[in-house]
Swiss-Prot record:
KW Transmembrane helix (keyword) present: no
GO molecular function: ATP binding; phosphoribosylaminoimidazolesuccinocarboxamide synthase activity
A UniProt-annotated Pfam family: SAICAR_synt
Protein name: Phosphoribosylaminoimidazole-succinocarboxamide synthase
Keywords in alphabetical order: ATP-binding, Ligase, Nucleotide-binding, Purine biosynthesis
SUPFAM superfamilies membership: SAICAR synthase-like
InterPro entries associated with the record: SAICAR_synt/ADE2_N (IPR028923), SAICAR_synth (IPR001636), SAICAR_synthetase_CS (IPR018236)
Catalytic reaction list: 5-amino-1-(5-phospho-D-ribosyl)imidazole-4-carboxylate + L-aspartate + ATP = (2S)-2-[5-amino-1-(5-phospho-beta-D-ribosyl)imidazole-4-carboxamido]succinate + ADP + phosphate + 2 H(+)
Highest taxon above the source species: Bacteria
Species of the source: Trichlorobacter lovleyi (strain ATCC BAA-1151 / DSM 17278 / SZ) (Geobacter lovleyi)
CDD domains: SAICAR_synt_Sc
Alphabetical list of PANTHER family matching this protein: PHOSPHORIBOSYLAMINOIMIDAZOLE-SUCCINOCARBOXAMIDE SYNTHASE
C-alpha cells in the first residue's frame, strides 16, 4: 500500500478546481484530472483519506469507459503518464495509476442519475410520496426492490459543501436544452443497462449510479468518472435480499457508520476509526477486483 494522497500540489501546474475527490489542473489544451484518496459522505469531506482509493476509482472508470465507447465517447486522452506534457513528468510517481489526461469539455449543468432499485434517498422519497423524484411507482414496493424499468432522475450540480437537489426532466431541459437533455438521458439508461448485465455476470448488482456529461467539439461525451463505488451502489448478488438495506462494495458502508453517530451531516466531519478506514478501502478494492480482475 502506498502513502495516501489527500491532496496534490504541483508547482508549475495550474490548479483550477479541487472538488470532493478530484484535483483538476489546466494544461492549456487539455485537463489533468487527479483522483485523490479523499472520501466524502453526505457532501462532507472526511478528514482521513482511504489509501489507494484514487487508484481504484481511476482503474474502475477506465474499465467502464472502455466498455461503453460504442454508446458514447469519453473524455480520456491518455492514462499513461509518459504521454502527459513535460510539465507533469516531475510528478509522475504521484500521478501513476490515479490520473487521466482528459479533453476540455463544457459540462452539462445537471448530473444524470439512473436507479434500477428502490434504495437510499429514493427509498425515503418513495416511503413519503409513493414516487421517486416525482416519478410515480407501483404501490407495495419494499426497500431494495428491483424496479420493472430503470428510472432517470437528474439532479443539480451543487457547489462544494452544499447538497445536490433532484430536478424533473423538464427542469433539466430548461438548464441543458432539449436535445442535450434527451441525448444524456438515453446514454444514461443505455450505459446502465449494459453495465448491469456485465456486473451481474461477476456477482455484483448495480443498484443505481450517477454520470456526468459534457460537450466537446459540438458532441456529447461522458466525463468525470464512470460506475465507480463513489458514484454507484454496488451490492453482492449472492447476499441480495429485498426488504431492507443491502451489504455493499461502496461508500454505503461509511454512510451506515456515520448514521450511527450523533453528527449533523455538516462540516467538520467526525474522526473515522482506523477500522472503518481500512474496511472502506477493502470494499473499494474488492469491487475493482470483482469487476475488472485488477488489484492495486
Amino acid at each position: 500500500m502506498s502513502q495516501p494522497v489527500k491532496q496534490t500540489d504541483f508547482p508549475g501546474l495550474k490548479l483550477v478546481n479541487r472538488g470532493k475527490v478530484r484535483d483538476i489542473y489546466d494544461l492549456g489544451d487539455a485537463l489533468l484530472m487527479v483522483t485523490s484518496d479523499r472520501i466524502s459522505a453526505f457532501d462532507v469531506i472526511m478528514n482521513e483519506p482511504i489509501p489507494d482509493k484514487g487508484k481504484v476509482l481511476t482503474q474502475i472508470s477506465k474499465f467502464w469507459f472502455s466498455q461503453m465507447e460504442d454508446i458514447i465517447p469519453n473524455h480520456i486522452i491518455s492514462t499513461d503518464v509518459a504521454d502527459y506534457p513535460a510539465a507533469c513528468q516531475p510528478y509522475a510517481e504521484v500521478l501513476a495509476g490515479r490520473s487521466m489526461l482528459v479533453k476540455k469539455a463544457e459540462p452539462l449543468a445537471a448530473e444524470c442519475i439512473v436507479r434500477g432499485y428502490v434504495s437510499g434517498s429514493g427509498w425515503k422519497d418513495y416511503k413519503a410520496t409513493g414516487s421517486i423524484c416525482g416519478i410515480k411507482l407501483p404501490e407495495g414496493l419494499k426497500e431494495s426492490d428491483r424496479l420493472a424499468e430503470p428510472i432517470f432522475t437528474p439532479s443539480t450540480k451543487a457547489e462544494l459543501g452544499t447538497h445536490d437537489e433532484n430536478i424533473s426532466f423538464d427542469e433539466m431541459v430548461k438548464v441543458c436544452g432539449k436535445e442535450l437533455a434527451e441525448q444524456a438521458r438515453e446514454a444514461t439508461i443505455r450505459i446502465y443497462c449494459r453495465a448491469r448485465e456485465i456486473a451481474d455476470q461477476k456477482g455484483i448488482i448495480i443498484a443505481d449510479t450517477k454520470f456526468e456529461f459534457g460537450v466537446y467539439e459540438g458532441k456529447l461525451i461522458i466525463i468525470d468518472e464512470c460506475l465507480t463505488p463513489d458514484s454507484s451502489r454496488f451490492w453482492p448478488k449472492d447476499q441480495y435480499q429485498p426488504g431492507g438495506p443491502q451489504p455493499s462494495f461502496d461508500k454505503q458502508f461509511l454512510r451506515d457508520y456515520l448514521e450511527t453517530l450523533d453528527w449533523g451531516k455538516t462540516a467538520p466531519a467526525p474522526p473515522l476509526p482506523e477500522e472503518i478506514v481500512t474496511k472502506t478501502g477493502e470494499k473499494y478494492k474488492e469491487a475493482l477486483f470483482k469487476l475488472a480482475g485488477i488489484t492495486v
